[in-house]
From Swiss-Prot:
GO terms for cellular component: cytoplasm. It is found in: Cytoplasm. It catalyses: L-threonylcarbamoyladenylate + adenosine(37) in tRNA = N(6)-L-threonylcarbamoyladenosine(37) in tRNA + AMP + H(+). Pfam families: TsaD. Keywords: Acyltransferase, Cytoplasm, Iron, Metal-binding, Transferase, tRNA processing. It comes from Aliivibrio salmonicida (strain LFI1238) (Vibrio salmonicida (strain LFI1238)). Gene3D superfamilies: 3.30.420.40. One of its GO terms (molecular function) is iron ion binding. HAMAP family: TsaD. Disulfide bonds: none annotated. Required for the formation of a threonylcarbamoyl group on adenosine at position 37 (t(6)A37) in tRNAs that read codons beginning with adenine. Is involved in the transfer of the threonylcarbamoyl moiety of threonylcarbamoyl-AMP (TC-AMP) to the N6 group of A37, together with TsaE and TsaB. TsaD likely plays a direct catalytic role in this reaction. Its EC number is 2.3.1.234. This is tRNA N6-adenosine threonylcarbamoyltransferase.
């Protein structure tokens, strides 16, 4: 079975083809970073228009890479949500239309389930059950995962997501878009211990997150200190350290609460090297394992959507002719795969 996956939930256009026997056959990705850079963030209308231009050519490129035609495809998986409504409508309309034209099933996929299952594309995938930390620009979720679709949300951000806090703090420091990776790069030159940032919501029980106060603390620290390069690097280091420590503390709590020893981290922020090192050290101490996708599959991509769609189609899940786009869609509303 071969599934073509389409991802257009935000500012990346991703298309991939996944074979249930041979694995990933093709992977095409176009990033809109340059398009949005002048605005300091994603402009939804521009994102939607660019998806319109790029999706069909990327589908053809993926077919060419795999040496296939439309007749070799058994289903179309597309991101139905959550995400920017206009961007979602582009991918879902194209996906649903192509499925109708090619006479194959269409499978709407939850964007965060795609991220959660992205480590399954690796040579050493995690076994169920596990705890998943989903960290991106729009979401920070702690999820107990007993199987595909069998999800219980243990904690989530009550305000800014971790990736959003990275981007906003980077903007406060005058760093160009996309700010998160640039802040992490600046932090590499930082000195540990010069600044001490709080670890929000770690002084109380629970697994929810809050990063808006950390952003405010960063703003006050920036205003109170010199603007030389070393000071900027030290502030960036302290901020990144605080986010990583907070996530690690919450992960350890979640693992203790569930009695699990396997941790999956996915989403755009999971590409952060410092965060990976923190979680690896924490899991080593407790005798557990941590899994995450390769860097190119941490950010939005079509491969994770094709894989998730494959699992849903095998479970007999398809849709009628209606185009599905759900800007808000809690992951624990998904049906478990039997």
């Amino acid at each position: 079975m071969r599934i073509l996956g389409i991802e257009t939930s935000c500012d990346e256009t991703g298309v991939a083809i996944y074979d249930d026997e041979k694995g990933l056959l093709a992977h095409q990705l176009y990033s809109q970073v340059k398009l949005h850079a002048d605005y300091g963030g994603v402009v939804p209308e521009l994102a939607s228009r660019d998806h319109v231009k790029k999706t069909i050519p990327l589908i053809q490129a993926a077919l060419n890479d795999a040496g296939m035609t439309k007749d070799d495809i058994d289903g179309i998986a597309y991101t139905a949500g959550p995400g920017l409504v206009g961007a979602l409508l582009v991918g879902s309309t194209i996906g649903r239309s192509i499925a109708y034209a090619w006479d194959v099933p269409a499978i709407p996929v939850h964007h965060m389930e795609g991220h959660l299952l992205a480590p399954m594309l690796e040579d050493n995938p995690p076994e169920f059950p596990f705890v998943a930390l989903l960290v991106s620009g729009g979401h920070t979720l702690m999820v107990e995962v007993k199987g595909i679709g069998d999800y219980q949300i243990l904690g989530e951000s009550v305000d800014d997501a971790a990736g959003e806090a990275f981007d906003k703090t980077a903007k406060l420091m005058g760093l160009d878009y996309p700010g998160g990776p640039r802040l992490s790069k600046l932090a590499e030159a930082g000195v540990k211990g010069r600044f001490k940032f709080p670890r929000p919501m770690t002084d109380r029980p629970g697994l929810d997150f809050s990063f808006s106060g950390l952003k405010t603390f960063a703003a006050n620290t920036i205003r109170a200190n010199d603007d030389d390069e070393q000071t900027r690097a030290d502030i960036a280091f302290a901020f990144q350290e605080a986010v990583a420590d907070t996530l690690a503390i919450k992960c350890r709590r979640a693992l203790k609460q569930t009695g699990m020893k396997r941790l999956v981290m996915a989403g755009g922020v999971s590409a952060n090297t410092y965060l990976r090192q923190e979680l690896e050290a924490m899991m080593k101490k407790i005798g557990g394992e941590v899994f995450y996708p390769r860097t190119e599959f941490c950010t939005d991509n079509g491969a994770m959507i094709a894989y998730a769609g494959m699992q849903r189609l095998k479970n007999g899940e398809t849709t009628d002719l209606a185009v599905q786009a759900k800007p808000r869609w809690p992951i624990d509303q998904l049906a478990p795969i039997k």
